[in-house]
A protein has these predicted regions:
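A cross-family kinase active-site recognition segment
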Residues: 2-7, 11, 116-173, 190, ...
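An alpha-helical support segment within catalytic cores of ATP-dependent transferases
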Residues: 26-39, 143-195, 205-206, 256
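ATP-binding glycine-rich phosphate-binding loop
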Residues: 26-30, 34-64
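A conserved alpha-helical element in kinase catalytic cores
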Residues: 32, 54, 65-109, 117-138
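Conserved beta-strand elements flanking the ATP-binding pocket of the protein kinase catalytic core
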Residues: 48, 59, 96-102, 266
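Active-site acidic catalytic loop and adjacent metal/ATP-binding pocket
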Residues: 51, 56-62, 70-71, 98, ...
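A glycine-centered beta->alpha junction motif in the catalytic cores
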Residues: 64, 76, 92-93, 104-124, ...
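Active-site Asp-x-Gly
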Residues: 205-252, 259-262
Length: 284
């Protein structure tokens, strides 16, 4: 393995089954060549230590004119296949700016943000206001290439009907009822939604205080996007002794800042939590 690829990242990707393109092991064998080809294609020089998330290697680089950027090389998986299109469509409006992309290699050249500063360390109410404000800024019409939320929840409803031993039936029935109601609204597939707007997916920037990164875009209801802000910072959520009130406050702040219907966002949060529980029960 190349010195540019951290061992921790290799360990994270090793053993992954194709989703649906290539296994983690096979991709790791190709990764050093992908990096070298991308550095050559865009005339880049590595300018710092590699970073990574769950499914992508990120290298700080300098372009031929000396300007700073990052090279992102993603393990091919379905959720990320249209990331470059979403970033291109936003054009830097609320999200990291796309400088170049090679979809065949699953590589992107992106503006460099402050990777050491994310919303995880910002006071929770302020962080939720930032998330809501960027949800409003990222509100653009859906691209025709994107997968549709209506199709995703139709598949989910079928799974809910077959039951799940680890999940109380009342939760499954509640999620099914909510889906039946939510899909009747014309907004269901209308907007391009960043579906993983949790605190680590916002980085500090120079041209505005915060920008979103790592979109997993979906043609969806904007209210679907609020749920990930409920998933993290759990110690704060339970510290006050009233978990429900704390989570509802987070959601309320986000919805007020984003201009979203809070009841609709709450309904989607229940559906998404049940969906996550089902995936967890299948070893995902």
């Amino acid at each position: 393995m190349s010195a540019l690829v951290p061992e921790a990242f290799s360990a994270m990707v090793t053993g992954r089954d194709p989703e649906p393109y290539i296994s983690g092991d096979d991709w790791l064998l190709r990764l050093p060549r992908l990096v070298e080809e991308s550095l050559s294609e865009w005339d880049l020089t590595v300018d710092g230590e590699a970073m990574h998330g769950m499914a992508a290697l990120v290298l700080p680089v300098r372009r031929h004119d000396g300007s700073k950027a990052v090279l992102k090389v993603t393990w091919p998986h379905a959720d990320a296949r249209f990331e470059h299109l979403a970033l291109q469509h936003w054009g830097g409006d609320g999200a990291v700016r796309l400088l170049a992309a090679n979809p065949g290699r699953w590589t992107m050249l992106l503006e460099r943000l402050n990777g050491d500063r994310d919303l995880h360390e910002v006071p929770i109410d302020e962080a939720c206001q930032v998330i809501g404000g960027l949800l409003r800024q990222l509100d653009h019409p859906a691209l025709p290439q994107l997968s549709r939320l209506s199709a995703e929840v139709a598949r989910l409803a079928k799974h809910l009907g077959s039951g799940a031993p680890a999940i109380p039936r009342r939760f499954l029935e509640q999620a099914r009822a909510l889906i039946s109601d939510l899909v009747t609204d014309d907004v269901i597939d209308s907007r391009m939604v960043h579906t993983v707007l949790h605190y680590w997916n916002f980085l500090a920037a120079d041209r505005q205080p915060w920008l979103a990164i790592d979109p997993k875009p979906l043609a969806a209801d904007p209210a679907f996007a609020a749920t990930p802000a409920l998933w993290n910072r759990w110690e704060e959520a339970v510290a006050g002794g009233d978990l429900r009130r704390h989570l509802r406050r987070r959601l309320s702040i986000i919805c007020e800042s984003a201009g979203l219907d809070e009841e609709r966002a709450r309904a989607w949060s229940i559906v998404r939590e049940v969906q996550m529980a089902l995936l967890g029960g299948r070893g995902r």
